[in-house]
Amino acid sequence: MRIGLIEFLLILAIASLTVGPRVALFVDRWMRRANRANAMAARRRAEYAAQMAAERDAMLKRFRTASTVFGVGILLVLVYALGFRPIDTPPQIYKAPDLRQETGAMQTAVSTDRKTRLELGEYQGVDCIRTKDGLLYAAAWNGAALKKRTSDLVRTDGGHAAAILSVEGELTGFAFDAAGDVWLTQLTTAGGTLCRAKHDSWGAAVEQVVTQLDGAPLGAVSAVEVSPAGKVYFAVAAAAGAENGLESALRTELLAHTATGCVYVYDPAARTVEKVLGGVAGAAGLALSPDGSTLYVSDLGSRCIWAVDAAARELTAGGRGCTAAFAGLPGYPGALAADTDGTLYISYRWARSGWLEKNADSTLLRGIALRAGQNTQERLFRRTADAPCAEAVSLATGAWEQTFTGLAQDSCAAVCPVESKVYFGAAGADSLLAANR
């Protein structure tokens, strides 16, 4: 049977009237269910986002709290480390020395030309220079840390250099006696030692002579001088330890100003040690007058040179029997050298520090500097290009004859006049620099 268009439309109308409401109801229910599902999913997403935001805020709050606590802890540790941590050499209050007027002495620049230098070899510093029989001798060292440091006594004729003896640690000073023996001040992590070395064509033999005083190890031995009578004078920079070498010990004493440096004399015949001078704020150098009657002592922190009778005993710096031969110096005096013509050469370890002496009557900032470590302390003491590295003064008249400037290194550690030249040694130098006199 054929269904016409009208019949087909009637069938669709009947079907829509019969099934349509159910389909509409089904679609409506499905849409409602879908909307409810979407709403629930949206609520879950919102709840999850709110939960995540709350957790994030809580985590940030905990992190901020932890950061604050950590920062406060670090600050407290830093305050303790720099301001309250116990140190071996607490700073002492002292009166800063005056600064003398200009002397009008002749100005001489240390030559920087490599042709005028005396090369010693691969070394990191020079602590002492002496001359004997037309040859120059220098105490040169290698090794950044004292426990790894070795030192050589190097002899040079101006063209060839050779090490004649070697020691562990730092060879801070040496001097020849009338018999040709070498007296050495040696510094190791265990303390200081006064030694005697005999040298011949077969080599050198080093003998320890003084290793302790009153049962305690020697401190930072800094210099040695032998009198015409054979007495051996040696200086201990300060009572503080010297685990980082002589330069470090001298910087520590400059900051602390404990005035515990001493000068002793050893009698080889009697094998006795006696104190000559105490109360020195950094005994950094020694020299004897040409006749051996007067002993000159560098006082680093007081920026002066003390003069005492070489036969005197148990004196105190600035007290009876001890006079300031040269005071108000423009730098911190170190090594000394007295020429046979009566001229005293004074080397300056560092230039005068205005900051240090401004805080002489206060211990707070100096205590912080002492606790801050070696790198910070090294930056505190420098020498500008125009600052004197050494001066020459007449012992007879007290007239300042010559001022030497232009040493490239920060610390002038050694000075030695030889004929028409003056030779200088410094920390960080592998050669001897020269200037005319």
Tell where the protein language model's regions lie, with residue ranges.
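Juxtamembrane low-complexity tails/linkers enriched in Ser/Thr-Pro and polybasic
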Residues: 44-60
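Short hydrophobic alpha-helical membrane-anchoring segments
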Residues: 16-21, 77-85
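Membrane-interfacial loop-to-transmembrane-helix junctions in polytopic alpha-helical membrane proteins
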Residues: 2, 59-62
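Sequence-structural signature of mature extracellular/luminal beta-sheet repeat domains
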Residues: 79-437
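Internal/C-terminal transmembrane anchor helices
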Residues: 61-83
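Membrane-cytosol interface motif
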Residues: 35-46
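Hydrophobic single transmembrane helices highlighted by the model
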Residues: 1-25
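Membrane-spanning helices that line or support transport/gating and their immediate boundary helices
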Residues: 25-34
